[in-house]
Curated annotation (Swiss-Prot):
NCBIfam families: UMP_CMP_kin_fam. Consists of three domains, a large central CORE domain and two small peripheral domains, NMPbind and LID, which undergo movements during catalysis. The LID domain closes over the site of phosphoryl transfer upon ATP binding. Assembling and dissambling the active center during each catalytic cycle provides an effective means to prevent ATP hydrolysis. It catalyses: CMP + ATP = CDP + ADP; dCMP + ATP = dCDP + ADP; UMP + ATP = UDP + ADP; a 2'-deoxyribonucleoside 5'-diphosphate + ATP = a 2'-deoxyribonucleoside 5'-triphosphate + ADP. GO terms for cellular component: cytoplasm; nucleus. Its EC number is 2.7.4.14, 2.7.4.6. The gene is cmpk1. One of its GO terms (biological process) is 'de novo' pyrimidine nucleobase biosynthetic process. It is found in: Cytoplasm; Nucleus. This is UMP-CMP kinase. Keywords: ATP-binding, Cytoplasm, Kinase, Nucleotide-binding, Nucleus, Pyrimidine biosynthesis, Transferase. Belongs to the adenylate kinase family. UMP-CMP kinase subfamily. Catalyzes the phosphorylation of pyrimidine nucleoside monophosphates at the expense of ATP. Plays an important role in de novo pyrimidine nucleotide biosynthesis. Has preference for UMP and CMP as phosphate acceptors. Also displays broad nucleoside diphosphate kinase activity.
Length: 196
């Protein structure tokens, strides 16, 4: 069976991870965060990609698409090998730019079905405040204002155009992510009850 994929996009701090946890609990999806996979990979002492990933993340740049897709593909294959019923995936924080999207279409065409794009729309200042708050406890090296402003610029220049592209195909489901966690999840449930 082919993986059934929902791409989850939104700026840093839009609440993607929090909402994905709830979707997993309620709808049985497997959550794959492109960022978490990259962060885990760079910590592995024997990783062929570790140092490269580290330098990209530190500079707030987008990691080369081949690396990210190979990690996503491996994670989906491992999940499905362990449990044949687990074929629904939330892919969070990918595709981040046109190169990502083309790489996905080149590599995964016919191997996975993208059902829709869940887009958490949130103003930049709210996103920054949330990330600074999270940075106090998360220990993430990129949760500081300077890094965040770079990440938001990257997001606006690179990821927003992807959302616009998907909007033309009618695949984008947009949620106002500036509301409380519960209010946002109510909207998310409406979408998943209809779509998948």
């Amino acid at each position: 069976m082919k993986p059934f994929v929902v791409f989850v996009l939104g700026g840093p701090g839009a609440g993607k991870g929090t909402q994905c946890e709830r979707i997993v609990q309620k709808y049985g999806y497997t959550h794959l965060s492109a960022g978490d996979l990259l962060r885990d990979e760079r910590k592995k002492p024997d990783s062929q990609y570790g140092e490269l990933i580290e330098s990209y993340i530190r500079d707030g740049r987008i990691v080369p698409v081949e690396i990210t897709i190979s990690l996503l593909q491996r994670a989906m294959e491992q999940t499905m090998a362990l449990d044949g019923n687990k074929h629904k995936f939330l892919i969070d924080g990918f595709p981040r730019n046109e190169d990502n999207l083309q790489g996905w279409e080149r590599t995964m065409n016919g191997k996975a079905d993208v059902s829709f794009v869940l887009f958490f729309d949130c103003d930049n200042e709210t996103c920054i405040e949330r990330c600074l708050e999270r940075g106090k406890s998360s220990g993430r090296s990129d949760d500081n204002r300077e890094s965040l402003e770079k990440r938001i610029q990257t997001y606006l220049q690179s990821t927003r155009p992807i959302i616009d592209l998907y909007e033309k195909t009618g695949k984008v489901k947009k949620v106002d992510a500036s509301k409380s966690v519960d209010e946002v999840f109510t909207k998310v449930q409406d979408i998943f009850d209809r779509e998948g």
